[in-house]
């Protein structure tokens, strides 16, 4: 009559390392090999890069663009970028808009309350160079002499896409440990 053909099945008791097409398997040995080849600092930086919690200082028109960035259309949560209201829970400070001499001590105090490691993003022409208020008696110029700016996002105001790109650049700096933020 007919011949009975043997069919090969993936029985985990026979060969647990056998690959099944379309199925991703992780074995303990693969995890151990990954950990042996990876430095602990690289794993820590991977976690830091994928969980940036930022505190905003919305001054001027850049604050409106920051609010737009937080809407569902841009979905910054997919990058691990989450806003925080407390400086003690944030590791990124976004300085946006102009900084006045009266506001500077409060901004420094918020910076001091943030735990290390911490990073700073300067968003908008006003934060970077003073913008149209450059020659004003009350505007602080050269904010990068006061705070260690890691990423500059130019524009007046920069679009939400530019802010997201700035976060991606910061993530790459953290991954490569080329950020000039505070010590670890």
Curated annotation (Swiss-Prot):
Keywords: 4Fe-4S, Cell inner membrane, Cell membrane, Electron transport, FAD, Flavoprotein, Iron, Iron-sulfur, Membrane, Metal-binding, Methanogenesis, Methanol utilization, Oxidoreductase, Transport. Its cofactor is FAD; [4Fe-4S] cluster. Gene3D superfamilies: 3.40.50.12280. The keyword Nucleotide-binding does not apply. Optimum temperature is 39 degrees Celsius. It catalyses: methanophenazine + reduced coenzyme F420-(gamma-L-Glu)(n) = dihydromethanophenazine + oxidized coenzyme F420-(gamma-L-Glu)(n) + H(+). InterPro entries: NADH_UbQ_OxRdtase-like_20kDa (IPR006137), NADH_UQ_OxRdtase_20Kd_su (IPR006138). It comes from the Archaea. Its EC number is 1.5.98.3. Optimum pH is 8.5. [4Fe-4S] cluster binds at residues 61-62, 126, 156. Signal peptide: none annotated. Component of the F(420)H(2) dehydrogenase (FPO complex) which is part of the energy-conserving F(420)H(2):heterodisulfide oxidoreductase system. The membrane-bound electron transfer system of the complex plays an important role in the metabolism of methylotrophic methanogens when the organisms grow on methanol or methylamines. Catalyzes the oxidation of methanophenazine to dihydromethanophenazine. It shuttles electrons from F(420)H(2), via FAD and iron-sulfur (Fe-S) centers, to methanophenazine (an electron carrier in the membrane). Belongs to the complex I 20 kDa subunit family. The FPO complex is composed of at least 13 different subunits. This is F(420)H(2) dehydrogenase subunit B. It comes from Methanosarcina mazei (strain ATCC BAA-159 / DSM 3647 / Goe1 / Go1 / JCM 11833 / OCM 88) (Methanosarcina frisia). The gene is fpoB.
